[in-house]
């Protein structure tokens, strides 16, 4: 509904192997997320949610719903999606991350990141397989200063201290003012709704 990329056949097959059923859901046509929805998955949206969609999504999350958001570099303004994310203490820092640590990127491609994978219930199966994760042309996820005490944010994927965020990509060299690493490129956010 927002120009998302289609899920790859291999990803869809992996979901099916794990017994996960998937179906599309148009948030503009529902007043609430179906109760049997275990998780909403947004795959690189290129346009914003409407205010109504953001309200439906927020209500779902406030009731303990789950969401996976894979986002990409975009010039599109997304104030409604940004509002949902900021309610959970994060924001997308637009720009492209450049990694100058040779262990953190593909050789000769400093924008093709090989982030450090931190131990977490989400990432541990991947770590046990000694997996590598390639993130081409990634942006950073910043932790906001103000977040509810019930919200916990854990970094899952981070770049090295030698990385930096380029908002002006006319040069990939570091320039004064570039946000420096380590930078988050994957986070897990949970909220204790029992409080």
Describe each PLM feature range.
Residues 1:
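An acidic-aromatic substrate-binding cleft motif
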Residues 4-195:
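Acidic, S/T/G-rich, low-cysteine, solvent-exposed domains in lumenal/extracellular/periplasmic regions
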